[in-house]
């Protein structure tokens, strides 16, 4: 009993120490959150000087280095395409890689507005071509969302990575979903992986099928995209059948899509198609009719050649008619 009584004061002291540390941590967290809300309030009200003062006083961010809490004049000039103002600000020492609270750089803004001249000026001044926002968006992704091939080519020339980690937003998927087939063609020419699989989106081909972007689907298949790879166990043909797109269904089957493939629910494409629809009839017809020998030979030859070498088909010593057949022309 006496041992228990002697241990109580020490336990009480230990509790007080931990409680004090927790209280200080909570207070510090409260101050930071309050400052962030206050800075955001000033930004919304347009009082940039006050927001910059808060950032400089409490976070040590000086003017010209880019406050995380505000858009700099450099951001405004880039977003509005004011090239002369942009050059003037850069000559005055503004940081070309200044970031906002969301880690958006002036280059992000220039690409989002399709201002190629501004983007070139920023890149020549040393802008980070692969800068990532808190949402994982790159300047290349912004250029893609606008379908800007000029900005895209410029960024790629300066070393932009078309594909980063699998969890980040992909320019390829964005182009496929919005139907920017010229942009997609440009990315393919730079050697992207057309089968890049993002867990919550699937492959670019699957995304294009869900969005019913026929020209993008054609570009991806022509570049050698795997017609069976979709999202988890759902194939692109499942997506096309769900969207009731007869043109896309026929195209996928022509490129060798398996009409008997099953998803996680053990459903085939014909099972997910609308009842009595044209898509259902097409799938049932192909189910009852085997592919032609010519079709099977073409698929076999293309698989044997391999995706990295499909562009070399025109160099094969084959009749032009046969080359066109192998290239689906």
Swiss-Prot record:
Repeat (ANK) residue spans along the chain: 69-98, 102-131, 135-164, 167-196, 200-229, 232-261
Pfam family, one: SOCS_box
Xref: SUPFAM superfamilies: Ankyrin repeat, SOCS box-like
Pathway listed: Protein modification; protein ubiquitination
Keyword Repeat set for record: yes
Tissue specificity statement from the Swiss-Prot or TrEMBL entry: Expressed in endothelial and smooth muscle cells of collateral arteries as well as in satellite cells.
InterPro entries reported in the protein's UniProt record: Ankyrin-SOCS_box_domain, Ankyrin_rpt, Ankyrin_rpt-contain_sf, ASB5_SOCS, SOCS_box, SOCS_box-like_dom_sf
Record domain SOCS box: where: 278-329
Upregulation: Up-regulated in growing collateral arteries.
An annotated GO BP: protein ubiquitination
Signal peptide: none
PROSITE patterns: ANK_REP_REGION, ANK_REPEAT, SOCS
Taxonomy, superkingdom: Eukaryota
Keywords, comma-separated and alphabetical: ANK repeat, Repeat, Ubl conjugation pathway
Record text about domains: The SOCS box domain mediates the interaction with the Elongin BC complex, an adapter module in different E3 ubiquitin-protein ligase complexes.
Function: May be a substrate-recognition component of a SCF-like ECS (Elongin-Cullin-SOCS-box protein) E3 ubiquitin-protein ligase complex which mediates the ubiquitination and subsequent proteasomal degradation of target proteins. May play a role in the initiation of arteriogenesis.
Similarity comment: Belongs to the ankyrin SOCS box (ASB) family.
Protein name: Ankyrin repeat and SOCS box protein 5
């Amino acid at each position: 009993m006496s041992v228990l009584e002697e241990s109580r004061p020490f336990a009480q002291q230990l509790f007080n120490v931990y409680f004090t540390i927790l209280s200080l941590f909570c207070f510090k967290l409260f101050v930071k959150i309050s400052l962030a809300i206050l800075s955001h309030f000033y930004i919304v009200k347009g009082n940039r000087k006050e927001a910059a003062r808060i950032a400089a006083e409490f976070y040590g961010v000086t003017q010209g280095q880019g406050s995380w809490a505000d858009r700099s004049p450099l951001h405004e000039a880039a977003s509005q395409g004011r090239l002369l103002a942009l050059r003037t600000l850069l000559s005055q020492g503004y940081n070309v890689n200044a970031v906002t609270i969301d880690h958006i750089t002036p280059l992000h803004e220039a690409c989002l507005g399709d201002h190629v001249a501004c983007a070139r000026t920023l890149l020549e001044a040393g802008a980070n071509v692969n800068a990532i926002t808190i949402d994982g968006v790159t300047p290349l992704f912004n250029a893609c969302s606008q379908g800007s091939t000029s900005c895209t080519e410029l960024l790629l020339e300066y070393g932009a990575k078309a594909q980063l980690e699998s969890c980040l937003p992909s320019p390829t998927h964005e182009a496929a979903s919005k139907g920017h087939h010229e942009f997609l063609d440009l990315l393919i020419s730079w050697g992207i992986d057309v089968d890049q699989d993002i867990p919550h989106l699937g492959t670019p081909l699957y995304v294009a099928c869900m969005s019913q972007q026929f020209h993008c689907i054609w570009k991806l298949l022509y570049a050698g995209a795997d017609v069976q790879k979709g999202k988890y166990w759902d194939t692109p043909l499942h997506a096309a059948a769900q969207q009731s797109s007869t043109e896309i269904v026929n195209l996928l089957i022509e490129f060798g899509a398996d009409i008997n493939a099953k998803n996680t629910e053990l459903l085939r494409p014909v099972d997910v198609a609308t009842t009595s629809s044209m898509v259902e009839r097409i799938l049932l017809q192909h189910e009852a009719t085997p592919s032609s020998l010519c079709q099977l030979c073409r698929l076999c030859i293309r698989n044997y050649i391999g995706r990295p070498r499909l562009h070399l088909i025109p160099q094969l010593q084959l009749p032009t008619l046969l080359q066109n057949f192998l290239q689906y022309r």
